[in-house]
Design a protein with these regions (language model features):
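Compositionally biased terminal segments of proteins
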Residues: 1-148
Length: 148
């Protein structure tokens, strides 16, 4: 499903480090609807301190550029971290418009891709977050997801 093996490698490291993450954005839309172009892998993470430390460890093991960053940065609600360039960019978000991570985590959909279990935001939570964002592409995605 993922256009680049780096995405799978990163998700595997997140799983190995017990990171609580949800795939959101274009890849989540693709999971529930028809394929469409996406320029990045968007992940929403829990901002609790243990999870932030796990994210930092996983990113360090991945070889991500972390100069000037600390574990605490990944516990800051509203912060985001970006690495790479489209179409293999990764965006890690510590909050999304209208989102409650704990609720979304409880509603998550886990999908097994040849032994790699990936946590996706639920279809309904994805629709709600797309509507809350208000961006034109997100509103189109929400409408498409609502008619499945």
């Amino acid at each position: 499903m993922f256009v680049n093996s780096d995405f799978s490698d990163l998700l595997r490291l997140f799983n190995d480090n017990h990171v609580r993450y949800l795939v959101i954005g274009g890849y989540a839309v693709i999971q529930y609807a028809e394929p469409r172009y996406t320029k990045d892998l968007d992940m929403w993470i829990s901002t609790d301190t243990n999870n932030a430390a796990a994210v930092y460890r996983a990113l360090k093991a991945f070889g991500a550029p972390l100069v000037g960053l600390t574990e605490a940065d990944f516990a800051e609600e509203g912060y985001f971290y970006q690495m790479g360039f489209p179409p293999v960019r990764v965006d890690i978000l510590m909050g999304i418009p209208g989102g409650d991570f704990e609720q979304a985590w409880n509603n998550r959909n886990e999908v097994d891709f040849d032994g790699l279990v990936v946590s996706f935001i639920s279809r309904q939570d994805l629709i709600d977050s797309k509507k809350a964002s208000g961006r034109p592409q997100d509103l189109i995605d929400a409408d498409n997801l609502s008619h499945i």
